[in-house]
């Protein structure tokens, strides 16, 4: 391995427990070994997921959160002894890898619970809620420190947990931790004084207006997590390590309002650095053996789950600062890179590096790092298209697919993640000659799957390069991981006997001598029938490098339009956005961490945004628009970029031996492109 990475593979201790290296796989929703949104079962898919990562040289593994009280059914976790019997059998196998595992137990979500439309009905309709209560007790699930508004639904409020309920939760943590310890689990992580979950809601003034022993003073607000670690230590002994998931600062300006990077002049309503310095020491003295750190709350979700737009290692400076106030180990997560993580550990600014979603994209990345095959690591691109499908548009949380609520920890670019039964390579019964028309991501993924199954594959690409429209999509300054993924695909393609014919446009599929044909010809931009359209350029033209002036009007406030606006800001230009809908990025399926960052960054940069506004005409020096009141006015600009979406451009229709993949089938995102390729190619 590279010399700079050697420090990542040195041992360290949490209490008296030695961990073999400094790489921590952080918890991700959907990877709970006790299942997620499914009561009374040990999740074998998650167990296999965790074991594969352990076999690939991870030091410490933290499975997804396990609610101390089942979300469905309301049963206390410690009451289900069968789960812990299976857990013990798993731990015996797990420990053969040399890795260690802490189970992450959560007190709950509180106001951060992502309520969908059905859940809202359970809350608002008392009769319906009573009927549903044995399955979904929404009143309890959403209970918080005080009556506070739900993050996802404008008119839903949490009720305060009672003191009796708090004591029950504390007792449940202790009982569950003992069962975990007896099953061979190496430690517990308490979830969480972090991200605005239930325990965090108790610690912060803006979500805690209690007047009893759990509200008011600093000590009272932090009493709940202190009582939990005290109870665990009393039951399991002082040597049983307990970690705390901890957000150093909240980066929160108010309900549903975060502070973006660079926005330093704001009033923190959550935990500021001064309080955090005190809290970290207070929590250490209470008995916690490690702080697993980042920043943010659900109101500033992009800090805890940083999308592509956030800087790499975005939480490191705050987390390394807090290490000065404790003597227990400190871990930092948040787009951590091995080089920066290793440097911080060497300089004693951190004890270990926390990584999460990179393990979804490539389960073997740590092994590749050790063996000096860094170029072969498939990079996470921070898209959140499959691992975090919770979006917020038109009032409540929504998802791409109902099943996503059960298993979130999937991966747009690695369908096998947490779906090993559905997506796995199997050799074809009969080897075929297969033509793939189009060398974009849909075409390349199809070719890789088909080649691994034993087929003879030829890609026909009309240009002189692979990756299709992703060449443009990956152009913005902050899309460096997208560009890394493009290079990964090119290298991966070269490892297989796949023929590529560049500068070859297929106009008649009948000229191909192929048993099966994959149409991966992508999509083209929509063109509005607007006077003066010749004075504008398409989004893809800008992303291809076409020059624009300093003042740029963007027609279309969807995801691409907003990403272009942010790219322009980073280049020192002044964008303004015209959008017909009543909000930016008004679509389902774009993760709230992504969309809220763009909305709030554009607001911070004072970008003019014209919602519910129609484009009437494009001129040499700007556009003519009409607002929702019917008022017509001019907007001045040096350049106009039109970004109103795309439409499929299949070469031919699908038939028995002709199959559509990617945007040629239906315009979507990278997840729909990659997964569709597998769905089609595993059947050939």
Where do the protein language model's features map onto the residues?
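A Rossmann-like FAD-binding core segment of flavoenzymes
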Residues: 481-526, 533-550, 570-653
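Beta1-alpha1 glycine-rich phosphate/pyrophosphate-binding loop at the start
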Residues: 435-499, 557-593, 603, 608, ...
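Internal hydrophobic alpha-helix adjacent to the cofactor/substrate pocket in enzyme cavities
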Residues: 362-368, 566-577, 673-684
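A conserved FAD-binding loop/helix module that cradles the flavin
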Residues: 587-591, 661-684
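Glycine-rich dinucleotide-binding loop and its adjacent helix/turn
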Residues: 413-428, 494, 502, 521-572, ...
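Flavin-dependent oxidoreductase catalytic cores
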Residues: 1-437, 441, 445-452, 457, ...
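Short, contiguous acidic/charged loop-to-helix segments that flank catalytic cores in large enzymes
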Residues: 305-311, 424-426, 431, 472-484, ...
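Active-site metal-binding loops of divalent metal-dependent hydrolases
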Residues: 334-336, 357-358, 523, 645-646, ...
């Amino acid at each position: 391995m590279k010399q700079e990475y050697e420090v990542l593979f040195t041992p360290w201790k949490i209490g008296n427990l030695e961990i073999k290296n400094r790489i921590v796989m952080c918890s991700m929703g959907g990877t709970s070994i006790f299942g997620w949104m499914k009561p009374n079962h040990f999740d074998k898919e998650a167990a296999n997921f965790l074991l594969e990562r352990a076999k690939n040289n991870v030091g410490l593994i933290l499975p997804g959160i396990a609610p101390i009280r089942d979300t469905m059914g309301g049963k206390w976790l410690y009451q289900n002894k069968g789960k812990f019997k299976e857990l013990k059998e798993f731990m015996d196998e797990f420990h053969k890898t040399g890795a260690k595992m802490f189970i992450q137990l959560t007190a709950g979500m509180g106001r951060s619970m992502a309520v969908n439309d059905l859940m809202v009905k359970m809350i608002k309709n008392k009769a319906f809620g009573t009927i549903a209560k044995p399955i979904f007790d929404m009143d309890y699930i959403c209970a918080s420190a005080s009556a506070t508004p739900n993050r996802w639904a404008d008119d839903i409020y949490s009720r305060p947990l009672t003191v009796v309920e708090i004591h029950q939760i504390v007792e449940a943590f202790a009982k569950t931790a003992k069962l975990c310890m007896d099953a061979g689990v190496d430690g517990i992580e308490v979830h969480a004084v972090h991200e605005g979950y239930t325990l965090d809601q108790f610690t912060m003034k803006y979500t805690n207006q209690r007047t009893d022993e759990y509200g008011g003073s600093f000590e009272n607000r932090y009493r709940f997590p202190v009582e939990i670690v005290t109870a665990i230590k009393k039951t399991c002994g002082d040597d049983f390590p307990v970690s705390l998931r901890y957000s150093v600062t909240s980066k929160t300006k108010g309900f549903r309002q975060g502070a973006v990077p660079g926005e330093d002049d704001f009033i923190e309503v959550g935990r500021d650095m001064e309080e955090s310095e005190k809290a970290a020491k207070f929590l250490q003295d209470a008995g916690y053996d490690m702080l697993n750190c980042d920043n943010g709350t659900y109101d500033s979700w992009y800090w805890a789950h940083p999308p592509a737009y956030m800087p790499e290692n975005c939480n490191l400076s705050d987390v390394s600062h807090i290490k000065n106030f404790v003597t227990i180990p400190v871990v930092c997560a948040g787009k951590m890179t091995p080089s920066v993580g290793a440097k911080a550990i060497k300089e004693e600014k951190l004890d270990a590096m926390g990584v999460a979603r990179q393990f979804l994209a490539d389960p073997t990345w740590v092994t590749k790092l050790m063996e000096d095959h860094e170029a072969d690591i498939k990079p996470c691109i921070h898209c959140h298209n499959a691992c975090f499908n919770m979006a917020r548009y038109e009032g409540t949380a929504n998802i791409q697919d109902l099943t996503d609520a059960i298993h979130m920890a999937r991966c747009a670019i690695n369908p096998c993640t947490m779906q090993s039964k559905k997506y796995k390579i199997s050799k074809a019964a009969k080897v075929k000659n297969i033509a793939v028309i189009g060398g974009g991501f849909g075409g390349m993924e199809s070719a890789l799957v088909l080649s691994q199954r034993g087929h003879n594959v030829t890609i026909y690409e009309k240009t002189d390069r692979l990756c299709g429209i992703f060449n443009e999509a990956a152009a913005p300054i902050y899309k460096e991981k997208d560009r890394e993924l493009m290079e990964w695909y090119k290298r991966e393609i070269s490892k297989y006997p796949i023929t590529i014919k560049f500068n070859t446009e297929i106009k008649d599929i009948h000229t191909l001598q192929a048993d099966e044909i994959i149409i991966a010809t992508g999509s083209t931009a929509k063109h509005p029938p607007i006077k003066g359209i010749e004075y504008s350029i398409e989004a893809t033209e800008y992303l291809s490098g076409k020059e624009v002036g300093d003042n740029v009007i963007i027609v279309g406030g969807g995801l691409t339009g907003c990403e272009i606006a942010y790219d322009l800001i980073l280049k020192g230009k002044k964008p303004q956005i015209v959008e017909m809908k009543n909000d930016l990025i008004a679509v389902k399926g774009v993760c709230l961490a992504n969309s809220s960052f763009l909305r709030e960054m554009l607001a911070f940069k004072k970008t003019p945004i014209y919602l519910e506004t129609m484009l009437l005409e494009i001129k040499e020096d700007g556009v003519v628009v009409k607002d929702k009141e019917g008022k017509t006015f001019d907007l001045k600009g040096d350049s106009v970029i039109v970004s109103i979406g795309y439409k499929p451009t299949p070469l031919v229709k699908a038939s028995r031996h002709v199959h559509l993949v990617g945007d040629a089938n239906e315009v979507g995102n990278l997840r729909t492109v990659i997964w569709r390729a597998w769905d089609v190619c595993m059947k050939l």
